[in-house]
């Protein structure tokens, strides 16, 4: 079984970091993993997208991803770009209200988490991406939350290691929000 998750936003929202974190967590769980990211020339504010493919078996390299199983959208700019790859029943974790519900995604499982607002309320304004990732993981079980937390030390560069506890709290807050709202997907990623 193979699952493709596309994460989209703008530069400065941590899209490449959260994709790398999910990929690392998947490897720690014994999955085959491939990640590829694309971003604009601007460091902050340009488009940023990354797709992580996780599988039980070998991944054909490079993978052609005609459909995505889940989307994490932090900014409305990227939603239109990923729309052609959306399959029926896609899981959409979106940073609400910044990212409105897409009109043409019929049957999508919509997890509208106020990630930016939650991050600000925690005193972690840069933690919205981690909150959304925690929500995605709780809603889909694509990887375990504990695997994400364990992967933080391997993914964060040395000068960011001091932020491990804050990132862990953001991941846990996103997962807790999904549990509180009862917005978990009906089927887990690997069932």
Where are these regions (language model features)?
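Active-site cofactor/cluster-binding pocket
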Residues: 1-191
């Amino acid at each position: 079984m193979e699952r493709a998750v596309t994460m989209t936003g703008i530069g400065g929202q941590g899209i490449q970091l959260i994709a790398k974190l999910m990929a690392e967590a998947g490897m720690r769980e014994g999955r085959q993993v491939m990640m590829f990211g694309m971003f604009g020339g601007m460091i902050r504010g340009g488009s940023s997208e990354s797709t992580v493919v996780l599988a039980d078996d070998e991944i054909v390299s490079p993978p052609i991803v005609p459909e995505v199983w889940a989307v994490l959208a932090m900014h409305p700019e990227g939603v239109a770009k990923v729309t052609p790859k959306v399959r029926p029943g896609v899981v959409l974790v979106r940073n609400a209200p910044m990212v409105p519900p897409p009109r043409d995604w019929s049957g999508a499982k919509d997890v509208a988490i106020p990630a930016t607002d939650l991050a600000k309320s925690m005193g972690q304004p840069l933690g919205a991406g981690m909150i959304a990732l925690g929500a995605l993981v709780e809603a889909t079980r694509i990887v375990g939350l504990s695997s994400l937390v364990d992967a933080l030390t391997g993914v964060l560069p040395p000068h960011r290691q001091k932020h491990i506890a804050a990132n862990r709290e953001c991941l846990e807050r996103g997962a807790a929000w999904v549990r509180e709202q009862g917005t978990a997907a009906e089927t887990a990623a690997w069932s």
